[in-house]
């Protein structure tokens, strides 16, 4: 599955359950740890930690599990492909809550400052940025452990999930802006 061997990566019409579990498990864990980190990091205020932690959790879960299936998934090739299952499994959700879109519009998900790709990345980065000052002001070992875990999850997502599990085998990789940036189109 590399350029050295000349073998192309297998494109999945139905991702294996293990890939879906790894993708969603790491996503949910990232969001939950991020919310917990914000709550713990800002617990010096009786309300700030809970408010900002809850806002982050709502933002991240709504962005990934409601907005994406409503706005991005209908334009994906997995929406139209019979009996398909993408790496997040959200094409199945999308088919139940959204009308079919235009696959030619799929690449637009990465256009503009507040595009869906940027919101997805923001949901991953926000807790890391928010926890940094909290570590200085309100240091604790549990907060440091959460911070390190979030960094590890981010590295795992970009260097293992995207490049080896998700994007490498995705049928949309030839039109997806993310796949192009990661260099997995030719693999």
What are these regions (language model features)?
Residues 47-82, 153-162:
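Hydrophobic alpha-helical membrane-embedded segments
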Residues 77-80, 87-90, 171-174, 180:
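Cys/His-coordinated zinc-binding microdomains
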Residues 84-115, 183:
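Short membrane-interface loop/juxtamembrane segments of multi-pass integral membrane proteins
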Residues 28-34, 107-131:
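Core segments of transmembrane alpha-helices
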Residues 1-39:
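Cytosolic-side membrane-entry/anchor segment at the start of a transmembrane helix
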Residues 42-58, 135-151:
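Hydrophobic alpha-helical transmembrane segments
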Residues 164-187:
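Cytosolic/matrix-facing juxtamembrane and C-terminal tails of multi-pass cellular membrane proteins
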Residues 121, 129, 150-164, 169:
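Eukaryotic polytopic
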């Amino acid at each position: 599955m590399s350029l050295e061997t000349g073998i192309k990566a297998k494109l999945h019409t139905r991702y294996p359950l293990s890939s879906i579990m790894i993708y969603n498990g790491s996503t949910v864990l990232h969001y939950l740890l991020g919310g917990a980190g914000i709550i713990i990091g800002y617990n010096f205020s009786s309300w700030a930690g809970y408010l900002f932690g809850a806002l982050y959790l709502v933002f991240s879960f709504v962005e990934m599990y409601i907005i994406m299936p409503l706005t991005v998934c209908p334009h994906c090739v997995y929406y139209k492909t019979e009996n398909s299952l993408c790496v997040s499994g959200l094409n199945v959700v999308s088919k139940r809550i959204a009308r079919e879109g235009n696959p030619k519009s799929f690449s637009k998900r990465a256009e503009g400052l507040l595009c869906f790709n940027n919101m997805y990345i923001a949901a991953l980065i926000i807790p890391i940025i928010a926890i940094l000052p909290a570590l200085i002001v309100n240091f604790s070992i549990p907060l440091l452990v959460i911070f390190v875990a979030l960094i590890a999850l981010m590295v795992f997502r970009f260097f293992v999930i995207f490049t080896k599990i998700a994007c490498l085998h995705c049928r949309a990789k030839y039109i997806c802006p993310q796949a192009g940036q990661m260099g997995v189109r030719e693999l």
